[in-house]
């Protein structure tokens, strides 16, 4: 969900 790969 953001600029990196989190669980978002």
UniProtKB/Swiss-Prot annotation:
GO cellular component, one term: extracellular region
Domain of life: Eukaryota
Keyword Secreted (UniProt): yes
Keywords, in A-Z order: Amidation, Neuropeptide, Secreted
Modified residues annotated as Leucine amide in this record: 8
Alphabetical GO biological process terms: neuropeptide signaling pathway
Keyword Coiled coil: no
Cellular location(s): Secreted
General function of this protein: May act as a neurotransmitter or neuromodulator.
Protein family per UniProt: Belongs to the allatostatin family.
Protein's UniProt name: Carcinustatin-16
Originating species: Carcinus maenas
């Amino acid at each position: 969900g953001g600029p990196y790969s989190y669980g978002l």
